[in-house]
Every structure is written in structure tokens, then in C-alpha cells.
Amino acid sequence: MKHLESQLAEADNWTYCAENVKSKQHLVDIKANVKNSQFATPLFEFSGACSGCGETPYVKLISQLFGDREMVANATGCSSIYSGSVPSTPYTMNEKGHGPAWANSLFEDFCEFGLGMELANEKMRARLVKVMNEAIASDCCPAEYKEVFAEWINNMLDAEKTKELAEKIIPMVEAAKDKCNHCKQIADLQQYLVKRSQWIIGGDGASYDIGYGGLDHVIASGKDVNILVLDTEVYSNTGGQSSKATPVGAIAKFAAAGKRVRKKDLGLMATTYGYVYVAQIAMGADQAQTLKAIREAEAYPGPSLIIAYAPCINHGLKAGMGKSQEEEEKAVKCGYWHLWRYNPALEEEGKNPFQLDSKEPNWEDFQGFLKGEVRYASVMKQYPAEAEELFKAAEENAKWRYNSYKRFG
């Protein structure tokens, strides 16, 4: 950090860049690969999260890919604090004035809250379809209007196509709304022309524990929502309490001697429905897999669940939080965290829906990984007699889980 006074001279430079240096995302396919994705304008920027936070890179990436049509239902927790603390928010708009719509609910009902947003959106779009069909059947609309309305109805679930058609429809109905009641109604509903991308964001405390019943209810609904679980393996915002995502051996509040039972496999549980897209990702370990999983989840016409590994200041990284991305890579390479995707659409093609993206771990590095984080290393200092047994159990659990995934793949 530098003193504010020393940086004031840069304000004019920043203003110049913000006002005159335009986005280059129209020059590339931002969804094609990792490099291209970073030409997209971030619609989540300058959050107040801890330095090196493992959560915010995922939120930023989603805003780059879908932010101009994104709706977010956010659980209470770290992600709600850095996303919506008065008087500022890191969510912003692009040059067209489009950006994410964000709202915050509680630990226990954030998924239901997001489902409600999706159901309301469905209802309003159904009303649009009804009005357009009435316009097509009426005599008050010109033939070219009817043609565009019919094209929208046939493509209303195609995000890019609805963007294209919205740019045609809005000026048409605005020009005719004083003469045509159908056009007036469509003009009033114009914000629903573009297919929205509904995201539900929460931490592991909300998703694995307090709000799990709601999460299960929402994915069981079959509705087209995307749930992002920012898995820090503790209740981060409330001070590092143990959750069902906390692995064996880790010290956390309410598990001061090291947790004694294994981590809940939320992702694998969700796959049992058979119609839920599920992915487990770690950006620092495999950026391409992260991008692919997020794109597949959003494109899947049903519920999706993405579980993202997020190093946290509560972990006590000995290398420092500036190395959080590298810590994710270490976690995957040693077998602590595993990368995989479950895509029900593949089963419809006669393929295995489960894809294990992690390579065979280097298990020799597992214990070293644990000792590189204070949440584990503290067990060795405070409970040396039990540390070896707990760390051995942690490694055995990780091997058991990886071997289970191998059998599915």
C-alpha cells in the first residue's frame, strides 16, 4: 500500500484510460480460450476482499463471460460483503450500460432466493411470448414486425441471438408503441428480451451446511440456474469455523484439535440426480478446465453446480496469500483437490457423463502440502501425538476419493 497523497497525481491518467481506452472484446471470441476471455471487460472489479482472496477470480471471470446479462442471488458471507457493502459495489456496467443485477439473501435461503428470481424471469418472458403471438395474429403490426417477433420466439433461449434480436425489436416497438398496444406492452417488457444468466453464489458454509436443504431443493427443481460454491473449507466471514467442507485434520473453530471426520462430497451427491451439471474446479491448477466448466454449466439447459476451490486467509498459507493461485495448483498436483466434470448432455450422446480432469496425483507431496498451511501445521505443534494419525487419515481420504472418481471415469 502507498500513501494516498502520493497517488493522487495518477487520477487524471486513470480517468483518461477509463474514458478513452475502449474494450477489445469485440475483436475476439471471448469464450474460445483463456487468453481470449481476458480481453472481455470485467464487470466485477476492485472488490474489498482480502488481498489474494481465492474467491474473487471466479466471480470476475463469470462477470467477463456473462456479466452483461447476469443476475446474481448472493448468500450472506464473504462474497456478499465484498460485493455489496455500502456505499460501493465492485459490480459495474459495460459501455452500453449493461451489467450484473445483484441481490443478497441469507445463509439459509440463498438458493431459493435465486430460484425465485429465475421463476419470475420465466413468467415475464412467457408474458412476452403471449403478447408477441397476439401481435402476430393481429392486423395492427406490419409484416416485418411479425417476422422479427416470430424469430425471437423461436430463439428465446439462445442468449446471443436474443441480444441481436433485442437490438432490432426495441427501436421498432418504441417507434410504434403509441399506435399499437401490443408494441407498447413489448416495449414495457423490453428488459426481458435478452436471455438472462441466473447465478446463485455462496460459500461452503451456506452450501454444504446451513443452506444445503435449499440447494438440494433448487437443483432438484430442474430449473436453469447456475450455482457457484466458493469452497474455502471453513466459514470464512464469521472467523473460520468448521463446516462440512472442512477436511480431516484441519484446525478450525469448533474443531480446535483438528477435524475428525471426512469432508462431505457435495458434488458427487449432486450427480446422483442424473440431470444436474456438476463440476469441481481450481483456477490456479487448470485455467482451461475452469473456463470450460463455467461455459458448459451456463450453456446446460438445467441446474448446474460448480464447486470452486478458494484458498482463504483463514488457511494461513505460509507462502502468503499472494501465492493463492499457486496453492490451488499444489492442491491438485498432490491430490488434495480433484478436478472433474459431470455433464448429463454427454449421456444423451451415449458417452460417459463423468470426466476426471485431474492427472494422477503425486502423493509424495501430500503431507508437504498440509504442512504448508497453518490450519494443518498447527495440529503438529499443539497435538503432535495425534497429528501423524490425522494427516495419514487425510491422505487416505483423498486417495479414496480420487480412486472413486477414477472408477466413474
Label every model-predicted segment.
Residues G54, Y58, V148-H182:
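Active-site diphosphate/adenylate-binding microenvironment
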Residues N36-T41, E45-A49, N104-L119, K123-C140, ...:
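Conserved thiamine diphosphate
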Residues M1-E5, E95-N154, A310-G409:
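Flexible, low-complexity linker and terminal segments
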Residues C180, V194-I200, D209-N226, L230-E360:
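Glycine-rich ThDP/TPP pyrophosphate-binding loop and its adjacent helix/strand module
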Residues M1-N36, H98, Y145:
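Non-heme iron-sulfur electron-transfer modules
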Residues K2-L4, A75-G84, A285-Q287, Y309-G316:
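A glycine-rich phosphate-binding loop feature that marks nucleotide/adenosyl-phosphate handling sites
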Residues N36-F39, F44-P87:
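N-terminal amphipathic, basic-rich helices that act as targeting or association modules
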